[in-house]
């Protein structure tokens, strides 16, 4: 035991460890002192928003008797501005009316918008609605940029086997790329954003922040809606900052007591952003804080098993977590005993909070930590044996689950209280197809961006290496291209499962939001590990109010 501890201490001093390979926090104590607006200003904003909410509700009642195109535009605008969460019932009623009127003789632009919104809201609508627009060669031809954009967005809610949507996606993407530089500035901005991230895959707050600026330039804007969206955005930003103040205090104490700074990434603000991507609404403030705490612990465990502890230490620590008692950690070195104590203290505090809220699922929280530790420990066996799985599917059986997404969905449901039933939690724990698809997107997107770094760190082989082995590709680029195809298939599975609606829409939306968050974080870089790549976005969501 003494020799084991001595070896651990020696390693801490002799290695640069993870802290030397990843940049330090970009935020530090920033949110302990950052106050976006004065309390009086905040109350005035909330009062004004309540007035505007009622005005928009009246507007929606009027829209109910308007033509189909106007209904679609109204819903689309509210969703892009990030205001739709205030009007779930009203929009559901409008979408029901839209579905009943879907057989009208519509032009291609309106048909595309109709198709996109119905699919997004879980309605079954056949892609055959596009057949009538094909020419003699079987192509759908248009030179209208706005129409191309609508078609492009519609094609991104396809499911497997929809050949017409596959073709629409290929052709509209190619055409939009060709004409984007020649479009007028506002439309050009929309097209470039869509080519980077299609509408269905965008994060609510990121999309709202971007579209508010676009909408402000529109000659057809409704000024009250613009002002409403700005105030609502600023109110949520202020709430997020209050949460980050509390979380900063917790994280500073956890780091100091558990001494994780020497090997673990310090990404608490980025983790809050991750959770906010899944639960952005104000009523889920506790969900964001609880999940940020839980998954910061998961992040520490990821780094611990990945690059810091020995195999023997990992085995002992995993066994201790499985026992979950004071005696279980006695065989571990001092630094792991300290970490163990602080993990249990955080979990106990969360359980007490949930019990106080009369949440009957509090006892399930610690299972996240235990299961993630077991996943990470299993991965070290592959690493130590230098084993390369024969197929991507074999790899994903372990690595997709270790992405933590399955656990985030389950723990997210727990944090929602009565919104999630015991049946919903049981369903989530069976690793249903939609959750598996989210996990696959997370794992594959992460591996694409982290492949080079992790290949040089002697960590577990990634799906990139496994894909190259399975398909006999000669270059990393070819393997990555194949992996991108698998990601697209996973998105199609998500759309398909949302159309089946095995669970309430409010719960399915959390899984979709998680996929959107993973898409954002790993689109151009590993945005969690190298959070400098998303610093500008975080500034716009947490620091700067909209004037």
UniProtKB/Swiss-Prot annotation:
EC number: 4.2.3.57
Single Gene Ontology MF annotation: magnesium ion binding
GO CC annotation terms, alphabetical: cytoplasm
Tissue specificity statement from the Swiss-Prot or TrEMBL entry: Expressed in roots and leaves.
Catalytic activity field: (2E,6E)-farnesyl diphosphate = (-)-(E)-beta-caryophyllene + diphosphate
UniProt-annotated binding residues for Mg(2+) 1: 302, 306
Keywords associated with the record: Cytoplasm, Lyase, Magnesium, Manganese, Metal-binding, Plant defense
Cofactor: Mg(2+); Mn(2+)
Keyword Cytoplasm: yes
Subcellular location(s) per record: Cytoplasm
Pathway: Secondary metabolite biosynthesis; terpenoid biosynthesis
UniProt key word Lyase: yes
Family: Belongs to the terpene synthase family.
Known role: Component of the volatile terpenes biosynthesis pathways. Sesquiterpene synthase that converts farnesyl diphosphate to (E)-beta-caryophyllene. Involved in indirect defense by producing volatile signals that attract natural enemies of leaf herbivores such as Chilo partellus and root herbivores like the western corn rootworm (WCR, Diabrotica virgifera) and fall armyworm (Spodoptera littoralis and Spodoptera frugiperda).
Additional remarks: More abundant in insect resistant cultivars (e.g. cv. Mp708) than in insect sensitive cultivars (e.g. cv. Tx601).
Name this protein carries in UniProt: (E)-beta-caryophyllene synthase
């Amino acid at each position: 035991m003494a020799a084991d501890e001595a070896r651990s201490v020696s390693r801490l001093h002799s290695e640069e460890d993870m802290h030397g390979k990843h940049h330090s926090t970009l935020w530090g104590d920033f949110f302990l002192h950052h106050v976006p607006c004065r309390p009086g200003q905040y109350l005035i904003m909330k009062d004004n928003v309540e007035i505007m909410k009622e005005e928009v509700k009246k507007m929606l009642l009027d829209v109910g008797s308007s033509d189909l195109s106007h209904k679609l535009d109204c819903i689309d605008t509210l969703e892009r501005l990030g205001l739709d969460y205030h009007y779930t019932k009203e929009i559901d009623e409008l979408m029901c009316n839209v579905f009943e009127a879907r057989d009208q003789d519509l032009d291609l632009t309106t048909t595309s918008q109709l198709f996109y919104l119905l699919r997004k809201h879980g309605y079954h609508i056949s892609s055959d609605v596009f057949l009538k627009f094909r020419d003699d060669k079987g192509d759908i031809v248009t030179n209208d940029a706005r129409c191309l954009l609508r078609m492009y967005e519609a094609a991104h809610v396809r499911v497997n086997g929809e050949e017409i949507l596959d073709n629409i996606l290929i052709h509209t993407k190619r055409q939009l790329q060709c004409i984007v530089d020649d479009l007028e500035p506002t439309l050009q901005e929309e097209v470039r954003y869509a080519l980077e991230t299609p509408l269905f895959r965008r994060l609510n707050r990121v999309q709202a922040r971007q579209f508010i600026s676009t909408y402000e330039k529109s000659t057809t804007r409704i000024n009250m809606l613009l002002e409403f969206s700005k105030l609502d955005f600023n109110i949520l930003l202020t709430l997020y900052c209050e949460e980050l103040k509390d979380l900063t205090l917790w994280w500073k104490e956890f780091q100091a007591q558990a001494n994780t700074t020497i090997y673990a990434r310090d990404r608490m603000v980025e983790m809050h952003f991750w959770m906010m991507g899944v639960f952005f609404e104000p009523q889920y403030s506790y969900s964001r804080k609880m999940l940020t705490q839980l998954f910061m612990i998961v992040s520490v465990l990821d780094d611990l098993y990945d690059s810091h502890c020995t195999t023997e230490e990992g085995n002992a620590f995993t066994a201790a977590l499985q026992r979950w008692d004071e005696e279980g950690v006695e065989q571990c070195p001092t630094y792991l005993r300290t970490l163990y104590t602080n993990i249990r203290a955080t979990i106990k505090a969360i359980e007490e909070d949930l019990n106080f809220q009369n949440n009957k699922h509090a006892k399930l929280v610690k299972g996240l930590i235990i299961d993630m530790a077991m996943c990470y420990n299993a991965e070290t066996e592959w690493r130590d044996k230098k084993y390369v799985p024969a197929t991507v599917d074999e790899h994903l059986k372990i690595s997709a689950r270790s992405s933590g997404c399955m656990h985030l969905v389950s723990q997210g449901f727990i944090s929602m209280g009565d919104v999630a039933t015991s049946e919903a939690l049981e369903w989530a724990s069976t690793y249903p197809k939609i959750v598996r698809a989210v996990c696959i997107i997370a794992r594959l997107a992460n591996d694409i961006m982290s492949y080079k770094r992790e290949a040089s760190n002697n960590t577990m082989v990634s799906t990139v290496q496994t894909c190259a082995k399975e398909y006999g590709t000669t270059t990393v680029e070819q393997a990555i291209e194949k992996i991108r195809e698998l990601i697209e298939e996973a998105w199609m599975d998500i759309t398909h499962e949302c159309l089946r609606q095995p669970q309430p829409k409010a719960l399915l939306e959390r899984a979709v939001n998680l996929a959107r968050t993973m898409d954002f974080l790993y689109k151009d870089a590993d945005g969690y590990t190298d959070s400098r790549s998303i610093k500008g976005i975080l500034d716009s969501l947490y620091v700067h109010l909209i004037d």
